[in-house]
């Protein structure tokens, strides 16, 4: 099958360009001295066998991070980034992930704890591996690169050639496997990154002299005995050889056969002729210590192009490609990192072939530049990863300090904005929290519409859709419509016997002014009828007789909505109650933007100091908002006889805003354990009246320690899609991880950590 001709003659270039990529990344958990951790896999990440993202490999200390299959390099790295962050956040504070393939410090054999699994076969299998190969070689970590050619492309080729699509898949993937084994030496040259190991690693006493490119991919890595030779000349021969070794008990199972190419798509290789090879797992790659997640996005792209070019080009000799490729790969793996590649001419031809393919497929010019970058590395060995590692070793005299330093840096970077998931920082924080907790608990996540904050969650065959962090199928359609309309909210609650403020609904300034005479010097609140974000609200706690101030407040509210409410102001303190599935999970006191004097600094300086809190930012990508020094703040200070240059006495409080919204710089203070239970029950009843599973209830309460009566509270409003991050990361008090409660609501049969 001349695939290149078929593609060009039938205009399949675009379909051929579509692939699916997945990454599996192993890594050892270490302590800050570089010693491998002896702790068990983090309990909050259990059960590992049910988590598709975070598992363990051979050793209990060897964490394995697995991405979902993605359509492009950017997305697969994004998912890997997210999983990496989740893993680091849930590891003990003094643990890190070693960034190189081979640990700098290998523990005593007896101290290496084999991964703990539930299935007896998994335990038996690992005990067998220990007995046959020893523990040290299996402590080596790497990257597995999963690659699938688009099914539509395969079907088109099948239709054009009048061939069964399963046969097309098997033929193309078998060719790809042979080609990869033949030319993988180039990838070993470029990405080899395990140039040395301590003496105890070499259990039989034999070791290479000096530095090499890749111990992991050489005979010193985790390889089968020399008498295990499996042919890739055809799928039938591959199956015959592999099943024969298992039958003769030279291998305990098919998966004991270790090759840089593994076929995926069936439980056993014997099923591949009928089911077809679905994708190939390339197990060749060392960890790149200079990449925070073990591999760079540009290298995921280069490997993609390299693999695709192997399908594009014709085969040399499929009978000898495997043996020749093995020889080439071994020679490169054991060559010195600063040595010129002995197959330079062939390497340059491969790269030229890649560039020609890029042009013929009309791929981006950036791909040409990337290939040329690798061309430079081919003719200058000092630019390769292995050479850079050796330079670091020679500079430090040890790889230990270098590796630990990087491990600490990568964890510090991942935890710097600990309240967010950096790979998804374009999404709102509540959605990020749900994604993070879903990954932690092994619930599959698919971002359907990033701009609209829409995600798909799946666990145990159950699919749920979530918008904006907590809008789900559990709520009725009418519920948010009731809460959006403050007049309807008040009427519904009033009918149910809840205390709500009296007032008027108006739609113009003239209408409002007609009510002014009745409202002079009465405590009132002026606010939009249908807003959910605290915008356009003015509070006159002591009333006003100034018609200009009254008019300004009315116009401010009318900016946010065509209809506004003028309500009585109920005396007391406002609290936000977060209700989910008939239970109040969090209670928050929101304090207006303020600073506390120290007798030394001006108000402006105190604001600057307070804004240094990492939780403060734009309140979109941070849980809290930085306090501003604008006209509104200036007027608020003026009412208190203060200005930005005032130096407050120690303990003196200055308020820069009247309203307590987080979006205007307010403080969030957790009060869940301080509030009398009667108010929590009241909030649940209000949520039920709104027919809401998730609801933010705002109550004015005179004294939270005294039980609720009809006279000591008032309902300000009920909110759909209530903000979660101010509860999860409050300015002061205990964190309430409400995103976990959302997952518990959606997946009641699954244990959520």
PLM feature spans:
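ATP-binding N-terminal substructure of ATP-dependent carboxylate-amine bond-forming enzymes
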Residues: 417-484, 488-491
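Loop-rich catalytic cores of soluble enzymes, especially ATP-dependent carboxylate-amine ligases
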Residues: 5-10, 105-106, 116-135, 139, ...
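Terminal catalytic/cofactor-binding subdomain
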Residues: 1-130, 137-141
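A long amphipathic alpha-helix within ATP-dependent nucleotide-binding catalytic cores
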Residues: 249-261, 306, 310, 314, ...
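Sequence termini and other peripheral, non-core segments
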Residues: 1-54, 325-440, 469
């Amino acid at each position: 099958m001349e695939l290149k001709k078929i593609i060009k003659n039938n205009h399949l270039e675009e379909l051929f360009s579509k692939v699916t990529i997945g990454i599996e990344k192993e890594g050892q958990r270490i302590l800050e001295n570089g010693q491998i951790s002896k702790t068990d896999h983090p309990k909050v990440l259990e059960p590992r066998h049910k988590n598709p993202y975070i598992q363990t490999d051979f050793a209990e200390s060897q964490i394995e991070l697995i991405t979902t299959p993605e359509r492009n390099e950017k997305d697969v790295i994004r998912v890997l980034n997210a999983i990496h962050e989740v893993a680091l956040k849930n590891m003990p504070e003094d643990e890190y992930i070693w960034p190189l393939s081979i640990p700098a410090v290998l523990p005593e054999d007896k101290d290496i704890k084999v991964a703990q699994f539930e299935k007896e076969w998994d335990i038996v299998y690992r005990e067998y591996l220990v007995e046959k190969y020893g523990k040290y070689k299996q402590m080596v970590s790497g990257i597995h690169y999963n690659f699938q050619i688009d099914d539509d492309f395969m079907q088109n080729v099948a239709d054009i050639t009048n061939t069964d699509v399963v046969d097309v898949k098997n033929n193309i993937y078998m060719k790809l496997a042979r080609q990869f084994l033949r030319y993988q030496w180039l990838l070993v040259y470029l990405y080899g990154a395990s140039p040395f190991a301590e003496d105890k690693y070499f259990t039989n006493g034999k070791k290479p002299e000096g530095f090499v490119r890749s111990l992991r991919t050489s005979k010193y890595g985790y390889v089968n005995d020399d008498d295990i030779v499996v042919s890739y000349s055809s799928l039938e021969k591959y199956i015959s050889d592999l099943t024969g070794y298992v039958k003769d008990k030279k291998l305990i199972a098919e998966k004991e056969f270790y090759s840089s190419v593994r076929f995926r798509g069936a439980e056993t290789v014997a099923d591949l002729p009928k089911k077809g090879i679905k994708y190939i797992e390339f197990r060749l790659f060392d960890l790149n210590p200079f990449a925070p997640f073990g591999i760079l996005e540009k290298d995921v792209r280069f490997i993609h192009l390299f693999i695709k070019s192997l399908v594009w080009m014709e085969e040399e000799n499929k009978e000898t490609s495997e043996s020749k490729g093995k020889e080439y790969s071994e020679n490169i793996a054991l060559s010195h990192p600063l040595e010129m590649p002995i197959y330079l001419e062939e390497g340059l031809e491969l790269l030229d072939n890649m560039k020609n393919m890029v042009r013929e497929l009309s791929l981006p010019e950036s791909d040409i530049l990337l290939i040329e970058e690798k061309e430079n590395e081919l003719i200058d060995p000092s630019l390769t990863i292995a050479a850079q590692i050796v330079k670091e070793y020679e500079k430090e005299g040890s790889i230990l300090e270098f590796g630990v330093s990087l491990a600490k840096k990568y964890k510090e970077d991942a935890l710097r904005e600990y309240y967010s998931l950096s790979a998804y920082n374009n999404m709102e924080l509540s959605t990020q929290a749900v994604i993070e907790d879903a990954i932690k608990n092994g619930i599959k996540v698919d971002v359907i519409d990033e701009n609209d904050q829409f995600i798909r969650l799946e666990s145990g065959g159950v699919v749920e859709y979530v918008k904006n962090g907590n809008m789900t199928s559990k709520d009725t359609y009418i519920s948010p419509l009731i809460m959006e309309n403050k007049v309807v909210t008040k009427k519904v609650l009033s009918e149910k016997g809840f205390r709500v403020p009296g007032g008027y609904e108006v739609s113009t300034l003239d209408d409002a002014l007609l009510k002014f005479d009745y409202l002079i010097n009465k405590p009132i609140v002026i606010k939009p009828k249908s807003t959910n974000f605290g915008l356009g609200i003015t509070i006159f706690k002591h009333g006003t007789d100034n018609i200009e101030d009254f008019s300004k407040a009315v116009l401010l509210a009318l900016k946010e909505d065509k209809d506004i409410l003028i309500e009585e102001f109920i005396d007391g303190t406002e609290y936000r109650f977060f209700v989910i599935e008939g239970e109040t999970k969090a209670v928050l006191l929101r304090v207006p933007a303020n600073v506390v004097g120290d007798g030394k600094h001006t108000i402006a300086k105190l604001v600057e100091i307070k804004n240094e809190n990492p939780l403060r930012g734009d309140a979109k990508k941070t849980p809290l908002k930085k306090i501003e020094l604008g006209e509104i703040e200036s007027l608020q200070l003026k009412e208190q006889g203060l200005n930005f240059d005032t130096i407050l006495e120690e303990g003196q409080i200055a308020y820069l805003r009247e309203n307590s919204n987080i979006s205007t710089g307010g403080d969030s203070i957790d009060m869940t354990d301080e509030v009398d239970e009667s108010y929590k029950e009241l909030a649940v009843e209000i949520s039920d009246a709104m027919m809401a599973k998730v609801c933010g209830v705002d109550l004015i309460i005179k004294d939270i320690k005294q039980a609720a009566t009809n006279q000591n509270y008032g309902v300000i409003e009920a909110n759909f899609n209530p903000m979660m991050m101010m509860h999860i990361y409050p300015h002061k008090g205990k964190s309430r991880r409400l995103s976990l409660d959302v997952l518990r609501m959606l997946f009641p049969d699954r244990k959520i950590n």
